[in-house]
Amino acid sequence: MASAVQKSALLLCGDYMEAYETIVPLYVLQSFGVSVHCVSPNRNAGDRCVMSAHDFLGLELYTELVVDQLTLNANFDDVTPENYDVIIIPGGRFTELLSADEKCVDLVARFAESKKLIFTSCHSQVMLMAAGILAGGVKCTAFESIKPLIELSGGEWWQQPGIQSMFEITDCVKDGNFMSTVGWPTLGHGIKLLLESLGGKVCSLEKKQASVLFLIGDYVEDYGINVPFRALQALGCKVDAVTPNKKKGEVCATAVYDLEDGRQIPAEKRGHNFFVTASWDDICVDDYDCVVVPGGRSPELLVMNEKAVALVKSFAEKDKVFAAIGQGKLLLAATGVLKGKRCASGKGMKVMVKVAGGEAVMEKGCVTDGKVVTAASATDLPAFLFDLSTALGLTVMF
């Protein structure tokens, strides 16, 4: 996605930061040509921060699950607010530590003084309190346990009306140069608002709204579903996620794959839940321009389901756009979509692509061949989002 003006973002990180609230803005902004520096106090480029998934798993309060790590790409001590257009602070427990760090609090205050954008999520609004930014009635939202602290800090609490469940949480709020969200369920709208606030304009070659269907199941790759799903929402696309044996409002468990030190292959860890947004029987191929199959282990479930295989074949018969990430290529292989196509592939999918009649491209993280867009793994999502958006006729200009 071409950008006439280079934009830059600073991502303030720390151990146990919320994984979605870190990875989604990082990958989405990178795919749109925004430079993103990831920093953490007392750590340098090349060091890593632990990330966690936070979700409600049947208990009274959310559960925190350690999922993987993010490698920093810049040094905290080199940061100058004037070099950035926005600072993004994910949620997570790390903000409790950073709110007592004078250098971090001063950094946030300097962004505010410079009238730079500040984007907070879930619990990271504590950084605004520490910097004295909310005094004077700044409108703000957050995870509800933060409400009394926002009000005690002189802020004005805002909450999306009519919410009965997490499935219905979609909105966020902006007051001046301050953007706040209740957490990762609102990232579609939050990223849209962030792009607009950075001067981004979504341009489409098509007159009608692009529509995309994600095929998922239990143990779908966490970032492989959430990052493109939220990104396409931010671009104004109609986006649905379905699975054969669950109805709208039910959830699929996700998995994160973390390459731990000394291991030959990544370890699988439980990630967030992902809400199914439509019931299978309500899906009509004619309503969508593209079908996306994320990776993880869910493609093994889908390839054994006749309804899922038949649906993909119906997309093929109507010459739609196909996209797959990692193991998602398994379902495309079983339906003949990969025959004669060049496909981005890691080592684990090389044989599968070959027996399906495709050409495994090992040296590129993302490949587009005609109407088939493939990514080798979830780490290739920035390039994948660029290629998928291009295939849908969408660009973002700053």
From Swiss-Prot:
Tell me the superkingdom of the source: Eukaryota
Question: In this protein, which residues make up the domain named PfpI endopeptidase?
Answer: 7-199, 210-393
Disulfide pairs here are none
Expressed, tissue-wise, as follows:
Expressed in roots and cauline leaves.
The record's section on InterPro entries has:
C56_PfpI-like (IPR006286), Class_I_gatase-like (IPR029062), DJ-1/PfpI (IPR002818)
List the induction conditions: By ethylene, abscisic acid (ABA) and dark.
**Under the cellular component aspect of Gene Ontology, which terms does the record hold?**
Golgi apparatus
Q: Which Pfam families match?
A: DJ-1_PfpI
Key words of the record = Repeat, Stress response
Family statement drawn from the similarity comment of this UniProt entry:
Belongs to the peptidase C56 family.
Q: What does this protein do?
A: May be involved in oxidative stress response.
Q: How does it assemble?
A: Homotrimer.
The name under which this protein is listed is: DJ-1 protein homolog E
Q: Which gene encodes it?
A: DJ1E
